[in-house]
């Protein structure tokens, strides 16, 4: 006789493997796609795969937020920005200041490495143990606006910078 527990675990492992495979496939397609619109659509499909993985890992709130925020807002924003720009793919060469770009990149890596190794990574014990518990949303909200207020504010600055960049790109060459 087949044990239902083993069948459920095997099915869960198979679904996880399928979602991981689909997510990695679309992530690779984002990088290698020649058409920017297809790359944007592949990015949205990759985000759907990540949302499925969140739901499979019993973090339904994060899965729904992934769909609403990243797919519904960011993904569509990226597609609109790509479709509204009138630049041709593979156009003329872009003037790049390579030494300055290398210096900025090196500075960014130094900040990330310093932050990663210089932080004492304590586990947060304030979250409930059951992630499917509805009170988890309240715990996440409290943590965002208490312990993680600085990353939350940095995220708002990054979104503002991307909005300014999108407006700059959508203006067109003649209006700058």
Curated annotation (Swiss-Prot):
Statement: the UniProt record of this protein carries the keyword Membrane: yes
* This enzyme's EC code(s): 1.5.98.3
Query: Could you tell me which InterPro entries the record lists for this protein?
Result: Complex_I_subunit_6-like, NADH_UbQ/plastoQ_OxRdtase_su6, Nuo/plastoQ_OxRdtase_6_NuoJ
**TM annotation in the entry:** 13-33, 39-59, 64-84, 99-119, 140-160
Ordered alphabetically, the record's keywords are: Cell membrane, Electron transport, Membrane, Methanogenesis, Methanol utilization, Oxidoreductase, Transmembrane, Transmembrane helix, Transport
Q: How does pH shape activity?
A: Optimum pH is 8.5.
Q: Which reaction does it catalyse?
A: methanophenazine + reduced coenzyme F420-(gamma-L-Glu)(n) = dihydromethanophenazine + oxidized coenzyme F420-(gamma-L-Glu)(n) + H(+)
Q: What is its main location?
A: membrane
Please, one GO biological process term? methanol metabolic process
What are its GO cellular component terms?
Answer: plasma membrane
Query: Cellular location of this protein?
Result: Cell membrane
Highest taxon in the source lineage:
Archaea
How is it placed in the membrane, per its record? Multi-pass membrane protein
One example GO MF annotation: NADH dehydrogenase (ubiquinone) activity
Give the protein's function.
Answer: Component of the F(420)H(2) dehydrogenase (FPO complex) which is part of the energy-conserving F(420)H(2):heterodisulfide oxidoreductase system. The membrane-bound electron transfer system of the complex plays an important role in the metabolism of methylotrophic methanogens when the organisms grow on methanol or methylamines. Catalyzes the oxidation of methanophenazine to dihydromethanophenazine. It shuttles electrons from F(420)H(2), via FAD and iron-sulfur (Fe-S) centers, to methanophenazine (an electron carrier in the membrane).
The record's note on quaternary structure and interaction partners says: The FPO complex is composed of at least 13 different subunits. FpoA, FpoH, FpoJ, FpoK, FpoL, FpoM and FpoN proteins constitute the membrane sector of the complex.
The entry's family comment says: Belongs to the complex I subunit 6 family.
Q: Which PANTHER family match?
A: NADH-UBIQUINONE OXIDOREDUCTASE CHAIN 6
Q: What is this protein called?
A: F(420)H(2) dehydrogenase subunit J
């Amino acid at each position: 006789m087949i044990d239902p527990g083993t069948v459920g675990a095997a099915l869960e492992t198979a679904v996880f493997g399928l979602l991981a495979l689909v997510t990695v496939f679309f992530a690779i397609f984002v990088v290698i796609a020649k058409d920017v619109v297809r790359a944007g659509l592949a990015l949205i499909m990759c985000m759907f795969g990540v949302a499925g993985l969140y739901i499979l890992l019993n973090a339904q709130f994060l899965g729904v937020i992934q769909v609403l925020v990243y797919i519904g807002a960011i993904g569509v924003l990226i597609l609109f920005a790509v479709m509204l720009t009138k630049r041709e793919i593979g156009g003329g060469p872009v003037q790049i200041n390579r030494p300055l770009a290398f210096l900025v990149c090196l500075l960014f890596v130094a900040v990330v490495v310093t932050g990663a190794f210089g932080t004492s990574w304590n586990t947060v014990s304030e979250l409930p143990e059951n992630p499917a518990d509805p009170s988890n949303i309240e715990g996440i909200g409290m943590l965002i606006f208490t312990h993680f207020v600085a990353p939350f504010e940095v995220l708002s600055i990054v979104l503002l910078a991307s909005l300014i960049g999108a407006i700059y790109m959508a203006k067109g060459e003649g209006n700058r």
